[in-house]
Amino acid sequence: MALQRTHSLLLLLLLTLLGLGLVQPSYGQDGMYQRFLRQHVHPEETGGSDRYCNLMMQRRKMTLYHCKRFNTFIHEDIWNIRSICSTTNIQCKNGKMNCHEGVVKVTDCRDTGSSRAPNCRYRAMASTRRVVIACEGNPQVPVHFDG
């Protein structure tokens, strides 16, 4: 009887801890969130060079079958990026009203057009600028880089 009670208490404790933790987005949004992280988030401030873009675009699997023409890496902590989702909603390029804007440090990587996948070559441009991201879920998380 005591063992069963201990197991019940442990299960209750586990469920309580899970409940106190961050609420995870739904599976569909989680996949989009993970893709956003892979394609756009690099908290270290090591961007800015062509070499950086060439390496990161390859590491993040954006050059496997074709050279992605343009990509932006955000050099901010994920919590700073997620906080953008709590700003006022604005209209996205696709017409939806789930976009938000904020100012962050970025490296923009633009395909030079002189190479072929998987050995794509990029030009880098580092700056601090306004970005627009689409957010979904509860809590809201970034799922798409809109500009």
UniProtKB/Swiss-Prot annotation:
CDD domains: RNase_A_canonical (cd06265). Residues 1-28 form the signal peptide. InterPro entries: RNaseA, RNaseA-like_dom_sf, RNaseA_AS, RNaseA_domain. GO terms for molecular function: endonuclease activity; nucleic acid binding; RNA nuclease activity. It is found in: Secreted. Its EC number is 3.1.27.-. Keywords: Antibiotic, Antimicrobial, Disulfide bond, Endonuclease, Hydrolase, Nuclease, Pyrrolidone carboxylic acid, Secreted, Signal. Coiled coil: none annotated. It holds the Pfam family RnaseA. GO terms for biological process: antibacterial humoral response; defense response to Gram-positive bacterium. This is Ribonuclease 4. It comes from Pan troglodytes.
